[in-house]
């Protein structure tokens, strides 16, 4: 079996390693989402707030992800951009029930979407509208309008409703991200 996996990697048939940056305001559910994406036997039983960054590894059908889970507290947000240049994708997690911080959220999201490394390289961005299970949470379409996402060219970003606690919506979002990253990597080879 080791021989065949080595052979498939040699011919480019194995899983491709990719780096992604996972950002968003504090308490949006970034770490819980990444924990949900891991295999059941590797999931943590207790989630603690991220300080600085933590690397989490997980896989989809064709990609092996190295996710840089970035702290969302204000004092750490300036470090996000130093990871964009070596990433093939960005996940931006937001708390869809946190209406009070929508303006701040918009500013931080625009910083990511307009960052020179993200724009010049065409890095795909998947926005996870998390905590959709909370009563009064905004819908993905309401968030799109509130954040002005409809002003950005489609194809560079997508938004998905999720619930980190149950995993609802994560499969679809990761399929989208995997497809966009695969397309991105293929375009970089030509």
Curated annotation (Swiss-Prot):
Tissue and organ expression note: Specifically expressed in ciliated cells.
Gene3D superfamilies: P-loop containing nucleotide triphosphate hydrolases
GO molecular function, one term: GTP binding
Keyword GTP-binding among record annotations: yes
Presence of the UniProt keyword Lipoprotein in the record: yes
UniProt binding sites for GTP: 24-31, 69-73, 130-133
A GO BP entry: cilium assembly
Source species, domain of life: Eukaryota
Residues where lipid is bound covalently (N-myristoyl glycine): 2
UniProt keyword list: Cytoplasm, GTP-binding, Lipoprotein, Myristate, Nucleotide-binding
Family: Belongs to the small GTPase superfamily. Arf family.
Protein name from the UniProt record: ADP-ribosylation factor-like protein 6
Organism: Caenorhabditis elegans
Encoding gene, per UniProt annotation: arl-6
